Amino acid sequence: MIVDGFDLDKEIPLWALSSKGKSIMQTFTFADFKQAFEFMTLCAQYAEQIDHHPDWSNSWNKVAVKLTTHSAGALTALDVQLAKAMDAFASQVNQR
């Protein structure tokens, strides 16, 4: 699926596109709450840097994430950028 010039299947293959095509979603699973919280901390710091914030929830070792650009009412490059960063943070945390 091409969105805002990005091939989502190639760039962020682990993310699911919503039925209306306006958001992407993924649930990250970690070994325990500590890892999930570390992941969320890394993501929160990065989100502040780029001024783009996820909709998310945490339940023990799982973090469910939904990304969209509310001001545009659609997916944008910022969502893809944050999704890629979140994938990298998840790998980083899971390797510890």
Residue ranges and their predicted role:
Residues M1-R96:
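Charge-rich alpha-helical segments
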